[in-house]
Amino acid sequence: MRLLSFVVLALFAVTQAEEGARLLASKSLLNRYAVEGRDLTLQYNIYNVGSSAALDVELSDDSFPPEDFGIVSGMLNVKWDRIAPASNVSHTVVLRPLKAGYFNFTSATITYLAQEDGPVVIGSTSAPGQGGILAQREFDRRFSPHFLDWAAFGVMTLPSIGIPLLLWYSSKRKYDTPKTKKN
């Protein structure tokens, strides 16, 4: 009997602990390459896996200093009144890196109320980690189609192909006899 009452009490405590909102948040870079002077797209996804709505949800990302990144569109500090249970929200920010080099993309902070009269819950998003921001010149050197380089290569190879062709053609024309027609 004691064991049964202990099990019931433990199950009741577990169900009480799981009540309320529970948010899972992720932060991801959508660009394949981060390039100095080009747009860098960040996406924040917040999922409510709890049993009630999350209230006063605030996402704050202070990991992008203004001297290293310019904001093209979106905001790094966002607030939602509520996120319903079993639903999600997404937020996208477009930044422009101002300097090349390595940068540590750290996690953003998320705060919310799990229940209406409950304490403020503080959490973090996932962190993409350290990534390299390529210089514009390096990116162009690696990934541009190099039309001018190929045109210069073609012009430089023309003499080595064209001169023997002209010599052969003039020799062929000189020593080739035309066929006479018979009527």
Swiss-Prot record:
Glycans are attached at residues 88, 104. It is found in: Endoplasmic reticulum membrane. Residues 170-183 are cytoplasmic. It is a single-pass type I membrane protein. It holds the Pfam family TRAP_beta. It comes from the Eukaryota. This is Translocon-associated protein subunit beta. It comes from Homo sapiens.
